[in-house]
Each structure stands twice: as C-alpha cells, then as structure tokens.
C-alpha cells in the first residue's frame, strides 16, 4: 500500500517592520488590557491587530477614540470568535500559517476557564513557532519598547524535519 505523505514545514517568514499583533484578554483582565492599549496606542496604530471576541471590540473602540482625539488613523483590527467559542483555536491556526508575529495575552491566573485546554494549546503553539508572548503588562511593555519591535526581525526557528519524517511503529 502506497501512502503519500505531505510534510508541512514550520513557517520561516521574517517579521516585517509592520507587525501582526494578537491581543487577547480573559474577562477579569479586559480592564488591564485596555489600560495597556491606551498607554501604548501610539505604537499599536502602526501595526495590524488581531483580537478575539469582546477584547477585539474593546480594543477597536479604545483605539478609535485615541485616534479621533489625536487626528490619527486607527489600525486594522481583525476580530475572531470569542476564546471559548473557538477564537483561541483560530488564533493558533493563524500562528501556524505565519500570520501572527506577537501575542499579547492577559490571561487570568486566578480563574479557571471553560476553554483552558484551548489556552494551553495556544500557548504551546507560540513556543513551537517562537512567537514573542506577553502574559502581563510588564512583559508587554518590554516587547513594544524593544528596538526589535520597530525593525524587520528574523526569528530563529527550531527545525522539526526529523520529527515530521520519523518512523512510527504501527504494531
């Protein structure tokens, strides 16, 4: 029996100067993420933003208000489904496709989530694809204030070719 296998390689695209930034927050952290967005709005408006559910609506509204007050053009905000409704998995798929450069995810460490397994899978994918990830304000501030944030960047990715080509014992 012949089996055709297609090996999918890890996307090795460079991060361009204009980044694709995913912004996600659990309900108890939405206030924190909006405070962070308001603090960093002048950086964020130069990038494309991807958000899950309600967070996306709140981020978009905050940036529209800041841009209106300062005569700036708001950024593109792509809104996915809410996390528990599949938004975290949509975001993970975008990472695998090479469409996300940075993840800012303020998750709630004190509250179990109905979609904890999806959150864990999303965080695993960020490690697998070497995506800079911030889970708190300090780390998020360090990411957007880094000189690398304002430049093209070539992330170093682990080569998983041997894993994809491994023999699996079917006995």
What residue ranges belong to the model's regions?
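Active-site rim loops that border cofactor/substrate pockets in soluble metabolic enzymes
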Residues: 62-91
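Short, glycine-/small-residue-rich phosphate/pyrophosphate-handling segment
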Residues: 138-170
């Amino acid at each position: 029996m012949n089996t055709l296998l297609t090996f999918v390689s890890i996307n090795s695209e460079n991060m361009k100067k204009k980044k694709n930034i995913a912004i996600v927050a659990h309900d108890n952290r939405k206030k924190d993420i909006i405070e962070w967005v308001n603090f960093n709005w002048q950086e964020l408006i130069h990038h494309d933003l991807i958000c899950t559910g309600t967070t996306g609506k709140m981020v978009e509204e905050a940036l529209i208000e800041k841009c209106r007050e300062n005569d700036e053009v708001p950024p593109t905000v792509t809104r996915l489904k809410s996390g528990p409704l599949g938004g975290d998995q949509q975001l993970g798929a975008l990472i695998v496709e090479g469409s996300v450069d940075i993840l800012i995810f303020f998750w709630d460490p004190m509250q179990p989530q109905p979609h904890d397994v999806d959150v864990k899978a999303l965080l695993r994918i960020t490690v697998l694809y070497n995506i800079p990830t911030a889970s708190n304000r300090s780390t998020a501030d360090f990411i957007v204030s880094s000189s690398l944030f304002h430049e093209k960047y070539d992330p170093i990715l682990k080569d998983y070719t041997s894993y994809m080509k491994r023999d699996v014992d079917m006995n």
